[in-house]
Amino acid sequence: MSFKSLLKNLPKFFFLGLIHIYRWTISPLLGSPCRFFPTCSQYALQALKHHGCIKGLGFTIKRIGKCGPWHPGGVDLVPMTTLEESLDISPATNDDDSCDSQA
């Protein structure tokens, strides 16, 4: 990865790191199951990886806004930009730290 590319992706890496810290520290203490699949933190990881920082944060904020007793939950996948991406619906895992795909 070039220095220019690293600088461009720095905000995305920052937010990915914050989400991982949340998943390793705060999320286990909450103990309540998420009403959505994938979970909000998995959704945020996928949104940031597929759409970058600005769009990814937008999708994440919209998703977190749905979290509450007024919404039934269910399957809510990250919108994909191409048919090929939309066919890959595998959820992010705790050990998935790759940031290979970008929109």
Swiss-Prot record:
Transmembrane segments: none annotated. It is a peripheral membrane protein. Coiled coil: none annotated. It is found in: Cell inner membrane. One of its GO terms (cellular component) is plasma membrane. Keywords: Cell inner membrane, Cell membrane, Membrane. InterPro entries: Membr_insert_effic_factor_YidD. SMART domains: Haemolytic. Belongs to the UPF0161 family. PANTHER family: MEMBRANE PROTEIN INSERTION EFFICIENCY FACTOR-RELATED. Could be involved in insertion of integral membrane proteins into the membrane. This is Putative membrane protein insertion efficiency factor.
